[in-house]
Amino acid sequence: MKVVLRFKKRGMRRFLSTLESIKLVERSLRRADFPLVFTEGFHPKPKMSFLDAMPVGVVNLAFYVEIHLKDLSRKHLENLERTLPKDFPLAGAWICEENINKVVTSYRFKLITPYCMDLLSRKVEKKGKKISFGESVVDFEVFRAKEYSIFRYTQRRERLMNPLLLVEKDSFFVAICEEALTESGEDLSSFLERRGTRVKKSASG
């Protein structure tokens, strides 16, 4: 069976590299005695796949993992929840045969800063070229308060930019990947609710 797990990578865990995050997931699954399905060959590995890696330092609330299992019970999930660190919790689990890497087309981000700035005119270097941030977003919203500003936007997978490069160096900010989205703009968690079987309720926060 194929199962999709959603984790929330936050707190100090947001500073883990992609490889360290993958190792954390694999190690936690083994400790929780998940009945993993392995690849064939001389060096078998758990059959699992991940969505796009987010830059180190970005809070990732959409850390989805697709794994192949022999079976799954609530006991496995309870074991996993006890094994995981508090700043890398399990937020949802679904039995679903859909390939999430074929379903997801974009991501929704939130950027919180203590000041106002013109993000849309910012240019970021990507693969040796200066690319305008405004040209890479599908939608863009700004919410201003007395002491901070919240920028919310969506970017397609093929045009992802490191949100940490959008703010001034040494300034305070929080960059968050809120959710992965389908072609229609539906949250991946909602898509999994419709097309799969929920094993664990999706957590908020």
Provide a role label for each language-model segment.
Residues 60-110:
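Ordered, amphipathic secondary-structure segments that act as subunit-interaction surfaces
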Residues 1-3:
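Extreme N-terminal starter segment of soluble prokaryotic enzymes
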Residues 37-67:
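Short, charge-patterned binding micro-sites
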Residues 13-38:
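N-terminal ordered "arm"
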